Amino acid sequence: MDKKEHIAIFTTASLPWLTGTAVNPLFRAAYLAKSGERDVTLVIPWLSLKDQRLVYPNNITFASPSEHEKYICQWLEERVGFTSGFSIQFYPGKFSRDKRSILAVGDISEIIPDKVADIAVLEEPEHLTWYHHGKRWKTKFRLVIGIIHTNYLEYVKREKNGVMQAFLLKYLNNWVVSIYCHKVIRLSAATQDYTGSIICNVHGVNPKFLEIGKKKREQQQKGEHAFTKGAYFIGKMIWSKGYKELLQLLKDHEKELSALEVDLFGSGEDSDEVQKAAEKLELAVRVHPARDHADALFHDYKLFLNPSTTDVVCTTTAEALAMGKIVVCANHPSNDFFKQFPNCWTYDDDDGFVKLTLKALAEQPAQPTDAQRHDLSWEAATKRFLKAADLDKPLERKLSRTTSNFLAASLNLQEKVDEASAYVHHVASGFEVSRRIFGAIPDSLQPDEELRKELGLTDASTK
């Protein structure tokens, strides 16, 4: 009997922080493990109590990794409806205030023992390897797959000296990803390009949204008014997440859109400014605190307006389509996957936005087919992932006779180049001074005593 594949999924965030790299890898782990054909381990950051208070909402904290794991499993099972068959491991992490993200501490590849190391999935591989100092990922794992979630270049461009920073970051990202990943999957063309990468949306939606959409379709089939509310937008309330573009569009076209009423839902650093900008409009634009998108409050809205172009693949757009709503969004690479759905309407300019918004207010959403609904599911996303990663067929371990000598020589040369490049990165990431120059958290080369104690780490614990 063949040994089961073991897939270790490493990611950069964890619940209760409801960010994409906390939620999507969690669902990926659950659905990869669901069939029982493979062993799956989700490896997530553990934060000290001080950092938990900075990151997690509603004053939620955990005294131990086991308590944190229990919370995650309960949250997941409430949404997928089945008991998850994967395991959870924690790596030491620290929260970077200036980057607003969690960075790994020490060599996190050690969390997976060498004897079971097989396939690694790095969710945000650039983020996970910027400061990696330890065993080379490609050496430890038979196959390393990087999934690109975020366009860091766009975020960096908004900072001081952003153009120069983005230029340097582009080459740093290309360098570390090529060193540490065999395959690279980009969620959309809205990310940085990587040599040999493929574009594939390997994310699905929370099953709750598909259930909501199913009920709405049943109402439509009975001739009932399934959607009794107008337009809304939901997202973290910062200008760069679509609020700037949306409020500008509404301001510039108040006369044409005089019949439009819009509800905005979100919380964030720019909440007060968004509120003030909305109050200046003649249109009825109401601002509300953040709510769960699956809340019954949203079920009856007919139109989701989303002009954001900073996302790689917008989760809320997928959720709105799953609920059977019309989505009016920008004609942008981040929305390419959604164009296949009849309720996704894309615009190229202001006139297109106005025309489609008025059209949506006057019409009812199309009833999605079962196949279209399935394409939004995590079952379909998991199949796309397995195919994109070449995990849907047995690994070819032997080269053909006609090409083996040539390919072996080429691969050997490439391996030597990679090893030399990885050695340079290993040396540079091993000095505190060079680490700080490139933005690492001070004293993050090894976990401190507090993190080691909380995680029960010893020098031999992961060998």
From Swiss-Prot:
UniProt keyword terms in alphabetical order: Chloroplast, Glycosyltransferase, Membrane, Nodulation, Plastid, Plastid outer membrane, Signal, Transferase
Compartments it resides in: Plastid, Chloroplast outer membrane; Plastid outer membrane
Chief site of localization: plastid
Transmembrane intervals: none
EC number of the protein: 2.4.1.241
Keyword Acyltransferase: no
A Pfam family annotated for this UniProt entry: Glycos_transf_1
GO molecular function: digalactosyldiacylglycerol synthase activity; UDP-galactosyltransferase activity
Lineage top rank: taxon: Eukaryota
Keyword flag Chloroplast: yes
Enzyme category, top tier: transferase
UniProt induction comment: Up-regulated in leaves by phosphate deficiency.
Tissue expression from the record: Expressed in leaves, roots and nodules.
A biological process from GO: galactolipid biosynthetic process
SUPFAM superfamilies the UniProt entry points to: UDP-Glycosyltransferase/glycogen phosphorylase (SSF53756)
One cellular component term from this protein's GO annotations in UniProt: chloroplast outer membrane
Catalytic activity: a 1,2-diacyl-3-O-(beta-D-galactosyl)-sn-glycerol + UDP-alpha-D-galactose = a 1,2-diacyl-3-O-[alpha-D-galactosyl-(1->6)-beta-D-galactosyl]-sn-glycerol + UDP + H(+)
Function: Involved in the synthesis of diacylglycerol galactolipids that are specifically found in thylakoid and in nodule peribacteroid membranes. Specific for alpha-glycosidic linkages.
Similarity comment text for this entry: Belongs to the glycosyltransferase group 1 family. Glycosyltransferase 4 subfamily.
Protein known as: Digalactosyldiacylglycerol synthase 2, chloroplastic
Originating organism: Glycine max (Soybean)
Taxonomic lineage: Eukaryota, Viridiplantae, Streptophyta, Embryophyta, Tracheophyta
